[in-house]
Amino acid sequence: MNLPLASNVKHKRSTFKSSYLWNSLHAKWHYRFGKSEDAIVNWVDLLNRDSTKLRFNVVRNLIEAQAFQEARDYLERLEDNEHEESSELNYLLARCYIGQALIPQAKKKIEQAIQTKPQNSIYWDLLADCFLELGDWREAVKALDNSLRAAPKHAETNYRLGIIYAFHEEYLEALRCFQGCCQLKPHRSVYWEMKAEMHLQLEQLTDACHSFEKALRYGGTPDLAARLAYCYVQNNQIKKGIKYYKLTLKYEPDHYDSLSNLAAVYQNLNRSQDALNMLERAKNIYPKDPILLNNYAFTLVHQGRTRKAAEYYREALALTPDHPLILYNLCVCLTRKGNWQEGIDLLNLLLELDPNHSAGWALLGNIYDQTDQFDTAIDCFNKALKLA
């Protein structure tokens, strides 16, 4: 048996190590293990080799590594030569320009690519990116509509459209987009979640509940359970709401919104102690939340503990001195204790902040009525009724 000469084997190894395949694998290896600079050096070396073959895969790797200038240098060298891949060249150049925040140049290049291949949805997606960067969301929507015509089953394009519409408060259009997502990929939780949020915005509570149920089924998280609970409560399905708030708290005991909202549900059911228990847990998480302190005090009032409630109202006011609701609630508390003068002072402050606060005028009228200042009381009642 004839064995190859050692010098010949070494030569083959040397040749392989200088080959395109070896350097390409080497670059990917570097990039995979976080050595981006070494990978970029390898890729640029591959692009600088004399070859009639287009190296667009290498360019894509450079763009992914955010080496936009290196990719751009190669692509701009190719621009002078006519070839069949001009549309892809323009697309990749546009990606480089976007990466370098050169949006007008990117827009020009991607429009050139679209002229050559208008049926390519990826090109339309990039044009939409350009319009969004330029602040023209309606033109971005048109571009994404064209992308959908080119690729009708691309759920992610529908999702992008829905997000844009939702951001600009066009909730019905957004809903249609998210419905399309759910039809194309019915097991994606995030699509059902966004569909549910649009139903909520449109006050379609039953549909919102149904969509949140689907979202929870395909990707259950405590946040989704909490949103479903909120929907049920808003839809007057209180038992189901409580059930899902409890489910949320089972898996995430410190879920602040669920603790606060469940406390409100219990308070509305006259279960003040259960409400207080929830609020106590919430207070341990965020002890300086003025709205939480207000709700805590409100629950104490319903237990007849007005003195303690007043302390929490004052603590809340120290955090937000000009909050109308907290001011009013403290005034109610003071009135129940017969602390007329402080109540009058705080109500006057409230009415300076909000001169049309009808409940504030009515409460002030009641105080003056209790202190036998009847003419002043009548003036206050007239203002409460918008008669003066």
Name every feature range the model reports, one short phrase each.
Residues 31, 63, 98, 132, ...:
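Position-specific recognition of the canonical hydrophobic site in helix A of tetratricopeptide repeat
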Residues 21, 53, 88, 122, ...:
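Start-of-helix register in tetratricopeptide repeats
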Residues 17, 49-51, 83-84, 118, ...:
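Short coil turns that delineate tetratricopeptide repeat
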Residues 12, 43-46, 78, 112-113, ...:
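Canonical positions in the second alpha-helix
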